[in-house]
Amino acid sequence: MGNSQTKEFRPPLSSSNRRSHQWGSSSSHGRSPYSDRHHAESSRSRGSRPDLSILGIGGSSERDVATLEHRRETKQEREARRLEKERAARVKERERSMREEHVDGGYLVTQGVYVGAEDFNKVVTRQLMIERRLAPFWRGLNDFSESWTEHQLMAAARGLPIPPPDEIPPELEYKNPPKLTEDGKESSIQHLMVPITSRSQSYGSEASQSSTPAHSLPTPVSPIASGTSTSPLFRSRAKTLASLTTSKLGSQIDSTPKEIHLPEDPFVNGQPIEAYLYKDATECPICFLYYPPYLNRTRCCDQPICSECFVQIKRPDPHPPEHGEAEPNATAAEGDRQDNQDCQLVSEPAACPFCVQPEFGVTYTPPPFRRGLVYATDPTLRPNFASPVSSTSSLASANAPPGTGRRRATSLSANDPTVITTDRVRPDWAQKLANARAHAARRSAAATALHTAAYLMNSTASGNESRNFGLGRRGVMRRTGQSETPSASSRSGSPALQALAFLTDRRTPGHETDSAEEGAGNLAPPRNSSRRNRIDDLEEMMMMEAIRLSLASEEERRKKAEKEARKEAKRREKESKKAEKAARKHGFYSNNASSSALDVPSDARLGRVTSSSSSITGEDASPSKGKEVDRASPSATAASSQSSTEIASDSMTINPHPNVVEHGSSAQSLMAQPSAREPPKPSHLRQVSSASSSFSSLVESTGEDHSGAYDGNASSTEPLFNFRSLAAVIGDEDKGDETAEHVEDTSSKPSAEGSASSAAPVADEMLGQSTAPADPIAVGTVAEERDCLMPKELETQSVEITSATRNTEATT
């Protein structure tokens, strides 16, 4: 709607767009590609307008890139660019000043002896030099000889190569100064005047008509007298108020004297000014350059020093007072305040580089002539305006003290009117000191607030008083104040407010007042304790924090040592357990299968059977055989034999058919069956493993395959079946042959033939055997009772039993 009409009927900004638009509209009523291009260009031109980019409506990408590049400029780059501009402007100003301005043959700008930053006040220095209270910047000579002629002195002063003494270059030739005529006097007077725009209308007439000092001085220009002739006599109220408000500024401007140029006269007493100045050159003891003898003199030791060295001497940077020294610039009214602020930064005045006396200052005795710039308000120069100083005139009798030629015997005070101190050319030292003090106060306040907030938060979070010993007496006072005023802690309970209260320390949080007048009255007076106490408290807190950290590190080291000791004890305990296990294993195999355990005499056939079983197996005893099986004491031998007898009778009674086991399963499967049952007690196992008797031997030969299915808990009827089965085995001799045939027949079975052995030997032979062959069965029984944890060992033991049975057959 309105926007589309604006697009259609807004005139383009450029003339080319206007021509294309007119041509396209006159050629055809329809839309043309030229008109489309015109609309696109006009929209782009409207989008790139700077007034729209301010509102954020549009803007070109090039301008955005330029803006980003401008924003990327860092502070250091801006400072470097500013310093470069200042240096270029200073070089240009130095060239102009050296070409156009001078004071008695010297200059108002430095000559490049020092290349550092010129941080002295150039306006004040220029004013002091024009007033002849400070020596100008003379051009220094690297070399000097008293035998130099006038043209050699001129060449050295102008920076030219020094010619031979008997040869005068053309540029150094000079003629005697001509005498001035009346026309020359008038022209010189006009030359000495200030420009007409900067002085009053009656200045020229006064200067030309009168030559007395009283009438020749310029009248000060006041704001009322500076009004135009067409202005009304009575001004409006607004102008009157404006003049009153600017009267102070106007008085300051009018108090500044006007600079005027004295007539150009390159000769003094018939000599060129350079030759007159440098004929008695003096060396500056600091920069070792030769200058005219009109140098500054120190007020204390009367040593010469050039102005370029003098303006480089300044106060040291603000620093804390050393050895309890007081503020040197403090007045008597600030004595009490200084006691309260004894740790503030101080700025010591510069000391003399020769005698190291403080309040360094210089005096200056100008030469007996005047050249170059002067101030028009100087009353001693006004009588000579009509008759300028000639080459033969001198001001020694008019305004310069007579030169006695000897040094001053006494030092001058720093407050002497003729003394110029270093603070005079650097009047901003007080502002620098105030800025440094404010910066140090901010840093100290920030550090104090951080420490206090950290301690307050730690004490609030922990809730114990052990961490609060680092707060010192200030923390004790704060805790006491908070305990006395519980309502104040509810109002200012946050650590930030407490830190702020600690920082100001004007009043405690409990002394807050609701009225603004009482609050302002409490904040106005400073606190009683000084800043030194605050610094001491801060140092105390920092020392306590260091002690706390040291104690924490010592505690951590002790805990680490205890942990290492515990680990070492555990390691030693493990090693002792391993050694004990190894000792028990070696003791088990050495005492196992021996007759000494049961005090039973051994037999030759028993040894033969044991050796044959060991040779059949073909391997040593495994380290895991009989693991964690304790040997029974000899006192428990009777109980062990009784238990083994019960187990043997039980196994023979429960499973009296060995053929079922022969054809049904292997010995390993029979060993695995008791795992589903509840194992007996370990003491019972130890008794079984250590038991060795004739009954267990008989059980080995007859009921090996039935041992896997016995029930250890069914021991109530064991004695009846035990003796009955034993009597049947011993009494029946006819079954011996059948049993031998049966064992011979089953020995060819692959898996169960070792387990299905019977009582082939004669009963008296079986009863006479020792209990040594019962040990492998006992070991197998132990492994069987421990839920078949080692099936390979059980299988090996079964093989040993089979071999023992075969050897028994062979013996029979």
Swiss-Prot record:
Gene Ontology cellular component terms for the protein in this record: cytoplasm
Major localisation: cytoplasm
Region (Disordered): 1-97, 160-187, 200-232, 317-339, 385-412, 508-532, 554-718, 732-812
Basic and acidic residues bias (residue ranges): 34-44, 61-97, 172-187, 317-326, 554-582, 737-747, 783-795
Biased composition (Low complexity): 14-33, 200-211, 386-402, 632-651, 689-701, 748-763
Keyword match Cell division: no
Keywords of this entry: Cytoplasm
Location of this chain's protein in the cell: Cytoplasm
Polar residues composition bias: residue spans: 796-812
Assigned protein family: Belongs to the SIP5 family.
Function text: May negatively regulate the snf1 kinase.
UniProt-recorded name of the protein: Protein sip5
Organism whose genome encodes this protein: Neosartorya fischeri (strain ATCC 1020 / DSM 3700 / CBS 544.65 / FGSC A1164 / JCM 1740 / NRRL 181 / WB 181) (Aspergillus fischerianus)
Classification of source organism: Eukaryota, Fungi, Dikarya, Ascomycota, Pezizomycotina
